[in-house]
């Protein structure tokens, strides 16, 4: 009973609860105990099972799984929680978030520590995802430089119009990305990333703004 009370007090209604959350809460308990506890709480309607490994405490509306926002599930499962960062949006979704492209693809693209394959399709609620493994371990400290290097991999920054290039410059300055950061993580990306940074017009402006963003 105390375990159930602890779970109910730890999480808010209509917020995703991952089975991994419960495992971390009770490190001395077996996986079978965790599964049985979640099953019992689901049977008694204290929890609702949203999908495999995802639960939530029902709110006052009683509408079942419709109360759980799939984007909250996606964020917690693949991108971040209150204390950790372990993923980011990729491909067109990353370019769109920074302001380099006006729209994104229908399929949400995510790069995450929680995916070990080169890429696979996943569905959360009615949202289609394509999740791929991270080039290196993502955390709070390196999330922004990894996203910058991903952008440089995706597009030739030399060819960006002024407005889109300025959006990227603002991203660099806002996130305080430094030359040291870029040099440290370049090795985890294809050679084309280093070439785009070190040659031509991209080196001139990127080096200037990266240098001054650390001042």
Say what each PLM segment does.
Residues 63, 80-84, 138:
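Short, surface-exposed loop/turn motifs that are enriched in glycine and acidic residues
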Residues 133-215:
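Hydrophobic alpha-helical interaction segments
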Residues 1-2, 142:
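Short helix-coil-helix linker/hinge
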């Amino acid at each position: 009973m105390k375990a159930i009370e602890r779970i109910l007090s730890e999480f808010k209604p209509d917020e995703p609860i991952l089975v991994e959350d419960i495992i971390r809460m009770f490190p001395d308990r077996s996986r079978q105990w965790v599964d049985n506890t979640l099953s019992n709480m689901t049977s008694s309607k204290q929890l609702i099972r949203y999908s495999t490994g995802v639960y939530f405490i029902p709110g006052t509306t009683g509408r079942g799984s419709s109360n759980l926002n799939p984007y909250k599930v996606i964020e917690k499962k693949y991108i971040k929680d209150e204390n950790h960062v372990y993923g980011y949006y990729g491909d067109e979704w990353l370019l769109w978030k920074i302001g380099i492209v006006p729209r994104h693809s229908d399929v949400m693209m995510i790069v995450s520590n929680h995916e070990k394959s080169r890429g696979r399709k996943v569905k959360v609620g009615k949202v289609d995802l394509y999740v791929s493994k991270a080039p290196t371990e993502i955390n709070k400290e390196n999330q922004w430089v990894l996203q910058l290097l991903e952008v440089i991999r995706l597009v030739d920054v030399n060819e960006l119009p002024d407005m889109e290039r300025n959006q990227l410059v603002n991203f660099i300055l806002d996130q305080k990305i430094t030359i040291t950061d870029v040099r440290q993580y370049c090795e985890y990306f294809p050679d084309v990333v280093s070439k785009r940074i070190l040659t031509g017009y991209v080196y001139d402006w990127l080096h200037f703004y990266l240098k001054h963003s650390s001042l």
